[in-house]
C-alpha cells in the first residue's frame, strides 16, 4: 500500500511538473537584420524634393542626433541653425539668382525645376564651427548623424557645401547675419531635408581600397 501511494504521488508530481510553462530560448533576429546598417546602406543623396513641409518635431529629432555625434575632446564647437521658412529660402534664392546673371550658373537657375538653391529642400540645417584642429571633422560627423536620422524617419537629405560660398558675398551677407552665429564661428556646410521626390539608384562602392595589415 505504501509503495502504491509513493508511486501515485510521483506520478502526480511528474504530470504537474510537465504542465508548467517551460523556459524557451530567446528568439534571435537574423544576423543580417540590423536597422542601423540598413539605414547606412540605403541612404542616398536626394536632389529632388516634394514641397511638403517637414514637421518640426522630426527636425528636432534629426538635429538632436547631430548634436550627439562624436567630436574632439567633446568640445562641441559647433552651432546649428534650422531654416524651414519658405519666405527665407525664396528670398535667398532670388538674391542668388540675381548674383549669377551673366555667369555659367545662370542657365542652371533659370531651369523650371529650380525652386531654391538648396536642391529645393523645404528645410535646411546650417552647421557652423569654431575653426580648430578637429572641428571640420566634428561637423562632418554631425552631418552624417543627421542624414542617417533623416533616413530612419523616411526623409531624404543631402549635404552641401556649394551654397556656403554665397554667404561670403556682399549679396549673401544679410542672410549670413540673419543666422545670428556667435562671434568666431564660421558657416561650414548645410544639410537639406525633405520628402524625397526621387529614388536614385546606388552608386557602386569600391571595396578594393580596403586592406587589412598583418
Predicted regions span which residues?
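Bacterial N-terminal signal peptides that target proteins for export
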Residues: 1-6
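Bacterial N-terminal signal peptides
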Residues: 7-16
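Acidic, surface-exposed loops and disordered segments
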Residues: 17-214
Amino acid at each position: 500500500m505504501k509503495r502504491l501511494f509513493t508511486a501515485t504521488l510521483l506520478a502526480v508530481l511528474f504530470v504537474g511538473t510537465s504542465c508548467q510553462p517551460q523556459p524557451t530560448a530567446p528568439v534571435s533576429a537574423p544576423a543580417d537584420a540590423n536597422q542601423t546598417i540598413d539605414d547606412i546602406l540605403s541612404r542616398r543623396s536626394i536632389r529632388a524634393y516634394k514641397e511638403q513641409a517637414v514637421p518640426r518635431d522630426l527636425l528636432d529629432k534629426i538635429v538632436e542626433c547631430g548634436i550627439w555625434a562624436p567630436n574632439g575632446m567633446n568640445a562641441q564647437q559647433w552651432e546649428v541653425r534650422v531654416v524651414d521658412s519658405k519666405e527665407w529660402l525664396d528670398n535667398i534664392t532670388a538674391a542668388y539668382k540675381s548674383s549669377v546673371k551673366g555667369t555659367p550658373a545662370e542657365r542652371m537657375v533659370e531651369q523650371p525645376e529650380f525652386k531654391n538653391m538648396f536642391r529645393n529642400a523645404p528645410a535646411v540645417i546650417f552647421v557652423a564651427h569654431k575653426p580648430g584642429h578637429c572641428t571640420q571633422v566634428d561637423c562632418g560627423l554631425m552631418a552624417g548623424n543627421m542624414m542617417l536620422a533623416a533616413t530612419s524617419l523616411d526623409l531624404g537629405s543631402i549635404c552641401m557645401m556649394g551654397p556656403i560660398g554665397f554667404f561670403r558675398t556682399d549679396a549673401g551677407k544679410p542672410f549670413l547675419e540673419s543666422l545670428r552665429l556667435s562671434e568666431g564661428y564660421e558657416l561650414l556646410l548645410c544639410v537639406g531635408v525633405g520628402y524625397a521626390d526621387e529614388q536614385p539608384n546606388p552608386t557602386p562602392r569600391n571595396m578594393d581600397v580596403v586592406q587589412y595589415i598583418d
